Curated annotation (Swiss-Prot):
Signal peptide: none
Name of the protein: Heat-inducible transcription repressor HrcA
Gene name, Swiss-Prot/TrEMBL: hrcA
Organism: Synechococcus sp. (strain JA-2-3B'a(2-13))
Stated family: Belongs to the HrcA family.
Record's keyword terms, sorted: Repressor, Stress response, Transcription, Transcription regulation
Length: 389
């Protein structure tokens, strides 16, 4: 059934949603009449509220209370928010989202410090994102077969122990401890020189290859000077794959549980426990759900792809249009995970060469500041995409 609302009813829906987001209190006709200039009586507003309730956009938690948005009401609000079709019916006197100067500052820092410690920086981004939104922030680092090797370095750290450091082209650093090879007798005194020679050789041979490709490399045909190391190199690569590739697959940087617990919707221990269990045990399931949606196209009504920018919004470096990052928004019962039916999930992916590298996610109550949250998720994903290009 097609939803048909009058312009005033749509304005009243918007005002109700925004008032409830701001106060967490049921909204009545008197509050709306005092806060917004609809140009009609409270009785007319009350009738429109009743109509919005009849079509499932609002409901009354108690008989004598005002109205609060349903999941469907939030969905209509968000769809209107993200399209220009209803811009004429939007109450512009409603509260507008505040800018995020702190987030912008950290994103600028991301571009400057990317090569230093990406994991630490992503954790700080998650913490700031959680603080600004009042939600839980989840960020997965670059991972998967599209992450390629950029540099390999072998370092002697103790007698009989060598550390192999692998730097990827997404600026992550992985390490593994291995036993040194059976050095030729004339090379034992020049251990550092020999390790540097092997480091240069490995960097030359492995640069641009993915971790998944390491398992299939053959070291049977090597230059004369490295032939004696063939078996050791095979073992070294096996250690790198086991130690460096596998742990990153489920890694999630998270922050914001304290912020979430301040929300009135999570005042009950049962609701907090469900989310804590998800973060501790099921974060990979949530991230997999998001990644699968983007990979398969997902439900069109859940996704948002902003329109192409005008010529003034071109990327200054590449000269190409900087289309905003698509987002996926699950509201309440839309969530595939039943434990999140009282939550909203806003997520996006960041990419390199059109291949998804990781996800940026906010998890909070359905009573969420959608404008700010969507803008923040898009900003982080877009900056990561540009920084890792």
């Amino acid at each position: 059934m097609k939803l048909e609302l009058t312009p005033r009813q749509r304005k009243i829906l918007w005002a109700t949603v925004r008032s409830y987001i701001a106060t967490a209190e049921p909204v009545g006709s008197k509050t709306l009449a005092q806060s917004y200039n609809f140009g009609v009586s409270t009785a007319t507003i009350r009738n429109d509220l009743a109509t919005l309730e009849q079509v499932g956009l609002l409901f009354q938690p108690h008989t004598s209370a005002g109205r609060v948005p349903s999941d469907f009401g939030y969905r209509v609000y968000v769809n209107d928010l993200l399209t220009s079709a209803n811009s004429g019916g939007i109450p512009h006197d409603a509260p507008q989202p505040d800018p995020h100067p702190a987030l912008q500052q950290l994103m600028d820092q991301l571009g400057r410090e990317l090569g230093d410690d990406l994991d630490s920086l992503l954790q700080r981004v998650a913490q700031l994102l959680a603080h600004l939104s009042g939600c839980i922030a989840l960020i997965t680092p670059p991972q998967g077969p599209v992450v390629a090797i950029h540099h390999v370095q072998l370092v002697s750290v103790a007698p009989g122990r060598v550390m192999v450091l692998v730097v990827t082209d997404s600026y992550q650093t992985h390490s593994a401890l291995v036993s040194p090879p059976d050095w030729p007798s004339d090379s034992r005194e020049d251990l550092e020189d020999e390790l540097q020679l092997l480091s240069n050789f490995l960097t030359l041979k492995l640069r641009g290859k993915t971790f998944a490709e390491l398992q299939d490399l053959s070291w049977l045909k090597l230059d004369e000077e490295f032939r004696t190391y063939g078996h050791w190199l095979q073992q070294l690569l096996r250690s790198v794959v086991q130690r460096c590739l596998q742990p990153s697959l489920g890694q999630v940087f998270s922050a914001g549980m304290a912020e979430l617990m301040r929300q009135p919707e999570f005042s009950q221990a049962r609701q907090v426990q469900a989310v804590m269990q998800l973060i501790e045990e099921g974060a990979k399931q949530l991230q997999g759900m998001i990644g699968l949606h983007f990979a398969d196209g997902g439900d069109p009504q859940l996704a948002y792809l902003p329109p192409l920018p005008s010529s003034t919004e071109m990327d200054q470096e590449s000269g190409q249009s900087a289309r905003k990052t698509p987002v996926i928004i699950y509201i309440g019962s839309e969530n595939p995970l039943e434990s999140l039916h009282h939550c909203t999930v806003i997520a996006s992916t960041y990419h390199r060469r059109s291949a998804p590298l990781g996800t940026v996610t906010l998890l909070g109550p359905t009573r969420m500041a959608y404008e700010r949250s969507i803008a923040a998720v898009q900003a982080v994903a877009s900056h990561l995409t540009r920084a890792l290009a």
